[in-house]
Amino acid sequence: LKQDVESIIETAYTMIGIPYLWAGTSSKGVDCSGLVRTVLFMHDIIIPRDASQQAYVGERIEITSDFANVQRGDLVFFGRKAFSGRKEGISHVGIYLGNKQFIHALGDVHISSFEPADKNYDEFNTGRLLFAVRFLPYINKEKGMNTTEHNPHYLPQ
C-alpha cells in the first residue's frame, strides 16, 4: 500500500465497525492508538504503540478554531489540558479526515465530528481536544517513526 494520505484514510475507513478492545491491534478489535498504529503499519509505517507516545513524534500543530491548519491524515490528540505548570495528559487519538471529521476507536471504530451542527458531533472529545500532529513528512527522518526497511527490529537476519 502507498504511504500517502488518501491511501491511509481509505485503509482507516475499512476499519469502521471493528469493536473497541483495550490494547487491541487487529481486525478483531482495536483501541484508539491501536487503530492508528495498525492502519499505519498496513502502509509500512511504524510509530509508537501508545497515544501518549504517538503525540510526541512528527510536527505538533496547535489547532485553530476553524481547523484551517489541520490537514487530512493528521493525528488528533485528546486528554487533559496542561495546567499549573503540568504538561497535558494524552488519553485518546484519532485520524483527521477533513471537514472537522475524525475517525477513532471509542466503543467501536467510527467517524465523529467537531462541528456541533453535524449529526455525529462528539461533544465529549471536542471538549478535550488538545492538538494535532503531522507525521507523514517525518517518516524515516525522526526517531520513533520509520518504515520496516529502516527499523532494526525488521531487518533481515
Set out the residue ranges of the language-model regions.
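...with weaker cross-activation on analogous glycine-rich loops/strands in unrelated enzymes
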Residues: 47-112, 116-117
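Second-shell loop/turn segments in exported
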Residues: 19-27, 83
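Active-site nucleophilic cysteine motif
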Residues: 12, 24-43
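Generic hydrophobic alpha-helical scaffold/packing signal
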Residues: 37, 74-77, 133
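Flexible, substrate/cofactor-facing loop regions flanked by secondary structure
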Residues: 21-23, 37, 46-52
